[in-house]
Amino acid sequence: KGGIFQRIDLFEPGTLNVDPLLPNIADIFTTSTYEEYAAFGNATVHLGPRFDITLGGRYSHNKQFVDQGGTGLLAPPALESRSSEGVFTWSGAAKYKVSSNVALYTRVAKGFRPGGPNLLPPNVPAGTPQTYSSDSLISYEAGIKAETADRSFSIDAAAFHIDWTDIQLFTVINNFGLNANGGKAKSDGFEFTATLRPTRGFVFSLNGAYTKARLKTDTDPNVGGLSGDPLPFTPKFNVNANVDYSWSLGGDSEAFVGASLRSLSKQRANFDAGFGALYGLDRP
């Protein structure tokens, strides 16, 4: 159990000048403050030598304040935005030890991300979101953790399902890159990590994931996403391979060499409702 408190203050100055030889026609500033406090706790119940249940909870409350303004001929109109919200998140997990080297587990948890301001230049077109709201998710996971008796080989593997509500997305609206909310989404997949240590000093690891993440509902038309669209920047396949070898140089000195290889499948970029209309393209 415990508690935390954090406060983040951000100040973003800027100038607007059409010609270096002319005086500034606007001095612009954006001030943002984020304040949060939270209390949390976890408890584990041992139901015999092989079976454990762990429960956890966290309550947090955050406040945000955004102030944008400036001076000069083309200074933006004053903008003030305040938000305040509290949220309770939780988790529950069960683990069963098949043996001293093999364990099965399941886990379900609720997550949360606070909203915030979009830092934009002055006089943006109407309909450009100045702020974005919080989002939340519930994740479900089941997996296995196992290793050989001599620890020369180990593997972690899990399948997962995630349900999002009001998912935060990076998008382009009126030619400005910003954060917006996109309704409901889901993600299903599988991930694994395998590690091989055949000899002293030599380690080979391979990890990968398959993820199918899509919108469940249409977004706001300004965002440009439709139900069934893949989530941005989420490759379907992701594989990483790493190899390291270390050896002694005598005394306390060691040397090592290593190499890594990463492969990703293609992925969608951010949503942009105006891209197709601008270039005469149809949606796939």
Which role does the model predict for each range below?
Residues E35-A43, F88-G92, T128, I138-A142, ...:
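Hydrophobic, lipid-facing positions within transmembrane beta-strands of outer-membrane proteins
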Residues P49, I53, H161-D163, A180-F271:
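Gram-negative outer-membrane beta-barrel transporters
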Residues K1-G2, L55-G57, G92, T106, ...:
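Membrane-embedded beta-strand positions of outer-membrane beta-barrel proteins
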Residues K97, A103-G111, T131-F190, T195-R197, ...:
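Membrane-embedded beta-barrel scaffold of Gram-negative outer-membrane proteins
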Residues I4-Q6, Y59-F65, V108-P114, P121, ...:
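Transmembrane beta-strands of outer-membrane beta-barrel pores
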Residues K1-S99:
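Signature of Gram-negative outer-membrane beta-barrel scaffolds
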